[in-house]
Amino acid sequence: MAEPRVFLKENRGRIEENYLEQAKNLPRVFAPVDEKLQKCTEEVALACKYLYAFMPYSDIGNYPFEVFLDYAENGVRLWKENPQVADLPEEIFLNYVLFHRVNEEEIAQCRTYFRAEIGSRIQGMNFREAALEVNYWCAEEATYHCTDDRTLSAISVYRRGNGRCGEESVFTVNALRSVGVPARQVYAPKWSHCDDNHAWVEIWCDGKWYFLGACEPEEILNKGWFTNASSRAMMIHSRVFDTKIPEGEVIGTDGMVTMLNELKRYAVTKEITVTVKDAQGLPSEGAEVSFEVLNYSEYAPIAEKKTDSKGTARLTTGLGSLHISARMCSDGEWFYAETVMNTEKEDNCELCLVPQDKRNDGESEKWTAADIFAPHDAPVNTDMPTLEQKAKGNKRLTAANAHREQKVRNWSNPECERFLEKKVNRIEEAIAASYREDLLRVLTEKDRTDCISDVLEEHLELAIPYHGMMKKDTFVSYVLNPRVDDEVLQKYRREIKKHFSRAEKQELRDDPSRIWNLIEKAIVSRPEKERSSVITTPAGCIMTCTGSFLSKKILFVAIARTLGVAARLNPHDRSMEYMENGRFVPVLARTEKNCTLILKAGETVQWKYFQNWSIAKLENGRYTSLKLGAENFEDQILNLPLESGNYRILTSNRLPNGNMFANEYHFEIQPGETKEIELVLREADLEDMLENISMPEFMLKTEDGTEVKASDLTADGKHILMFLEEEKEPTEHILNEMMEQEEAFAGYAEQIIFVVRSKEALETPTLSKALAKLKNIQIYYDDFSEIINTLGRRMYVDPDKLPLIIVTNGTLNGIYATSGYNVGTGDMLLRLM
């Protein structure tokens, strides 16, 4: 008779060992955890220990034991009841079924609830079938919505019915794990062909990883709108919190998190080699090499490596341009080097480190051009659903959308209503009541969808005594406000107040800078036990006596506000500030900004920070971009007060084919110096802007409903496809541009195809006028439900903005596309034709 299976037999020893290490480091925190573990079954206790052994310290401080118990109990139940789960390799089960954290989201109980909701729908299914079905359930419950950077918990995404892609994928991964399907989030940290990033989901079945779009169900795996986009990525990564690293190429760490290279599943790749040498030409061992892509007009890291004894670092990446920088500290001095490498044509490059303070020595300050090439469109995942599968999927997606829209219609967080409707029985509570709406108003839209009434109640109760000591706006924003940065909103004021005597509180009010001195003595930073983007709450810092530098800064603001001192993190640089004599003053002495940079805009370019230009300072061998979002040019001039040092200005012109024309300006500015620089944007020739993209076949309808293949419409020569949204300004604008150049466009009228939703659109004033002037334009019809999205994504323009205009040259061969409002599109179309 076969021996009974033992839960986590292979990993039991190392789990116990790592758990004991965590408990040894945080004995005060783990004492009550150990007591609760004794009441659990052996399997559940071991599962809990795994979570505690490999979670960031911030999780230990931020959440009670009961939150993690939900994940452990659900994981053990799956292992006991589902043979597929029990048959998983233990490392797959631990990391991708049991583990509670996906990325940097808030953690809340959800797994048991999700399993109860989904379980009956996947009975008898294998992992592949279950993954597809779970994604339909996810689409019924949530969809995409652009929000701020704080990442919601999975249960909050479920409740509010939407989230950005990082939140949709957190939600979907948790849904999959809740029913035993191994799942993880993967990221394109920055695209190379456009200014953005994207996250989606991978599931493990039949011994390998497959992908799917979160809340974007298909009838097959390895299919999503991003399939083509991912083939143009220079990096796609996953992350693992365990110290036992799965097979794969490590491309960096973020504290206790390891990043793994997943690009080979999505794109054509190659291995490149970077050699770093010192000034004498000798190999530099241990140099940090950063691989970066130009995105939002700054060089953004996508992978980091350290050089070996030969001074080399290797990376598997895509076939496009990388900005590669290297840094190293020797005897307290930082050395730096950088270059741009086109990996399509080059296999290796060499960097020679120089002291960063001499970065610009001997160089005349001037603009230097850099051509940045995006990888070509070359998808390696080409599976497509059959026509029957596509029809079935469309029907199911329509039903899912209807279910979700009904669910979220008029939804609001009941906790907000509970907070507003609390009965007022005392005079003090009557005063507080007048501030209830103010407190909710100062929160973000996202905060109002997942805040908890009891948490807000404590902040209101303990802040009200200070309401008459300052202006109302100051009190509401910088004392009453429970939000400091992107931390989890929790109670902390009562916990903070009990740590100080009456005399100590008054001393800290008299000199708020002393709060930071206390924090520095009491709270230690353990970056190797953290994830930099996961914040320890003020209460968590106090409980664990640990926290990152950012977490400690948030704690400073929390303590100050608890004591009635108006405080904040500066919105530009996150520096700690408190109010003194009506203005915010810094807690830590800043480096004096005793230099002035005068930037001249020129006449023709509209400069937008982090869109077509940025400026970065070189410190500690790394360029860090300045945060200038609120700064604007006035009369073509922008005055920037700067610290002395070495800087780099980047300008970038993104072309329709995804490539970029970049300009770099390196300069040094001395104390007291004023320097003038005129920003220069490189212009593109027509041939630089074109692409050859094979579009999928699609059907349009004639006036009588006859279907016509797009391949037939685009077969001979060049054509202009225009999907129009009548009587909306962007469509009206291009129609007016065409009529202003009536004679020129009339020569191409037979090659222009207008696509509208209905015959009534043709009767609207501007469109009917355009058709009267350009008599031979072809008219076709579509409901815009699917084709717009497919073509927009395929041509790498925003499918949510109309009109969608595509120029073709030959059968289904797109050479240019634009969407939305763009001045000068008419001129561009004439140039292309």
Residues covered by each model-derived region:
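Short active-site neighborhood of thiol/selenol oxidoreductases, capturing the structured segment around
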Residues: 710-735, 751-754
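Short, internal strand/loop/helix patches
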Residues: 768-802
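A short, amphipathic beta-strand motif
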Residues: 270-281, 595-605
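Hydrophobic/aromatic-rich core segments of domains that either
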Residues: 2, 116, 120-136, 145-156, ...
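Secondary-structure boundary elements
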Residues: 3-160, 390, 395-544, 554
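Short Pro-Gly-centered beta-turn/loop motif in secreted/extracellular proteins
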Residues: 311-325, 329-332, 340-343, 632-657, ...
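Short, acidic Ser/Thr/Gly-rich low-complexity loop/linker segments typical of extracellular
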Residues: 295-317, 335, 620-638
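A short, hydrophobic beta-strand/beta-hairpin element that forms part of a small beta-sheet core
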Residues: 799-820
